[in-house]
């Protein structure tokens, strides 16, 4: 009996190994696509002298620490927006974020762009939900895996603020260093697929908050869809709510397009726009790329030339982000400074109104509660709009200040007029000088303008709304 069992196991083993060999042979025989257009478009093979960005980045850090951060800390801006800027974030490479439902080809697309297929570097892929971690792909001299706890503890990296999401999340965060030329210029972030089944969504950490953290810091966001899975559920709706205000950075990708016939592809393209229309309330829709991002050749009798041109357009978008990394970084810090300035003006106005309404017999808590509950009665926001270079579109939500002052007593703040020193000057004047002169001047030093000093709020406005910084096709 034992001999029969052993014989059966041996036969099964031989059968399985034979199937595995056939599968490997099939994979080896599958024609691979020419990748030369990737290297050409991204200029990976060009021996260009590496630009020395360190001087500009050091100047940017100095402006932030000397002119912006003092006011930011004094008025506890981070507790309103929960976006703390670190030195690692200022000096970091552009970040490209991959989002979308499960098994739509996000990891496969990263493998394809980096040429990691059939190497020990490749990300695991499959038809089932395979990515349960946030995977950060960075450049390194050799293949190296970094635990999330180590990444969060390293202040030199831009991921130290992720520690606030708890140990359960850090166990789902992983960094991979790969010696690849593209990763010398950009960082890729692969994310867990969105699963509409609520029970499967019990991840043990604040998934949406973590996504928001990466969205706020991403320079380019690829939202990937599979043409056979276009269902838009609650989780996907939540994702697009988080993407509001980032429309200029979103690129929608209809992947695996060579699986469909022409007529069906047109129907799917229309269905995708129909499903996403209620979620993207902007005049100009995001760019949609239709292609198949994997190493195998396009299937026969499909629009191969179209798919290739779409892929090249996407690569040009990616290259624009890489080329404009310093310009985008300076613009990001300037937008942050504008928000900090408006927040400080609002807190100062709340405090001034509180002092004006207080009398010897007044109950301070009741007086300030009345101001916070109905700021329009005291013209808080209208007064700020009368200030120079403040747009109504930049004002924060009134409700946000109820929560803000709920944990920060008004008595803990000083008036802006009291935030001055003989040697250091006034906080407000320093941040306004950074917005109108120093940051535009730094931008002009990159050769973008003939008269950098002329770029100020009087001419350009201090709008916080991000412009479309990337070239559309």
Curated annotation (Swiss-Prot):
Highest taxon of the lineage: Eukaryota
Compartments where located: Sarcoplasmic reticulum lumen; Sarcoplasmic reticulum membrane
Sequence segments annotated as region (G4 motif): 255-258
Region (G1 motif): 100-107
Positions of the UniProt region annotated as G5 motif: 278
Signal peptide span: 1-20
Gene Ontology biological process terms from the UniProt entry: store-operated calcium entry
Keyword Membrane: yes
Region (G3 motif): 190-193
GO cellular component, one term: sarcoplasmic reticulum membrane
Keyword Metal-binding: no
Region named G2 motif: 128-129
Glycosylation sites: 281, 389
Keywords: Glycoprotein, Membrane, Sarcoplasmic reticulum, Signal
One function term, GO molecular function aspect: GTP binding
PTM section of the record: N-glycosylated.
Bilayer topology term: Peripheral membrane protein
Domain Dynamin-type G: 90-331
Family according to the record: Belongs to the TRAFAC class dynamin-like GTPase superfamily. Dynamin/Fzo/YdjA family.
Protein name in UniProt: Sarcalumenin
Source organism: Homo sapiens
Gene behind this protein: SRL
């Amino acid at each position: 009996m034992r001999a029969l069992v052993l014989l059966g196991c041996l036969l099964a083993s031989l059968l399985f190994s034979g199937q595995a060999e056939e599968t490997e042979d099939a994979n080896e025989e599958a024609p691979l696509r020419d990748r030369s257009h990737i290297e050409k478009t991204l200029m990976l093979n060009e021996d260009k002298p590496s630009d020395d960005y360190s001087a500009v980045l050091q100047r940017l850090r100095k402006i932030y620490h000397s002119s912006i951060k003092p006011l930011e800390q004094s008025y506890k801006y981070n507790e309103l927006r929960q976006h703390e800027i670190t030195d690692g974030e200022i000096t970091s490479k552009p970040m490209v974020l991959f989002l979308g439902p499960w098994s739509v080809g996000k990891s496969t697309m990263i493998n394809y762009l980096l040429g990691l297929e059939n190497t020990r570097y490749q990300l695991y892929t499959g038809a089932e939900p395979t990515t349960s971690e946030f995977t950060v792909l960075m450049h390194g001299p050799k293949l190296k895996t970094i635990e999330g706890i180590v990444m969060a503890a390293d202040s030199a990296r831009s991921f130290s603020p992720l520690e606030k999401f708890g140990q359960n999340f850090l166990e789902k965060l992983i960094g991979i260093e790969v010696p690849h030329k593209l990763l010398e210029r950009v960082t890729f972030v692969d994310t867990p697929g969105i699963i509409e089944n609520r029970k499967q969504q019990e991840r043990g950490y604040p998934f949406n908050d973590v996504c928001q953290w990466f969205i706020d810091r991403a320079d380019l966001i690829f939202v990937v869809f599979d043409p056979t899975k276009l269902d838009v559920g609650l989780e996907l709706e939540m994702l697009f709510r988080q993407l509001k205000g980032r429309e200029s950075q979103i690129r929608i990708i209809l992947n695996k397009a060579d699986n469909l016939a022409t007529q069906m592809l047109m129907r799917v393209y229309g269905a995708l726009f129909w499903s996403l229309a209620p979620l993207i309330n902007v005049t100009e829709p995001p760019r949609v790329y239709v292609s198949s991002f994997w190493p195998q050749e396009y299937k026969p009798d499909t629009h191969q030339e179209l798919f290739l041109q779409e892929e090249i357009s996407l690569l040009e978008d990616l290259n624009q982000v890489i080329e404009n990394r310093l310009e985008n970084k300076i613009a990001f810090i300037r937008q942050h400074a504008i928000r900090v300035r408006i927040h400080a003006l609002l807190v100062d106005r709340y405090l001034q109104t509180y002092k004006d309404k207080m009398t010897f017999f007044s109950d301070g808590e009741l007086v300030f509660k009345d101001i916070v509950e109905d700021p329009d009665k005291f013209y808080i926001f209208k007064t700020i709009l009368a200030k120079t270079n403040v747009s109504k579109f930049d004002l924060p939500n009134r409700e946000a200040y109820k929560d803000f002052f709920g944990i920060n007593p008004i008595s803990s703040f000083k008036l802006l007029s009291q935030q001055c020193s003989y040697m250091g000057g006034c906080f407000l004047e320093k941040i306004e000088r950074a917005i109108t002169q120093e940051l535009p001047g730094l931008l002009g030093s990159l050769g973008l303008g003939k008269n950098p000093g002329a770029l100020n709020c009087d001419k350009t406005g201090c709008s916080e709304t991000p412009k479309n910084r990337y070239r559309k096709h």
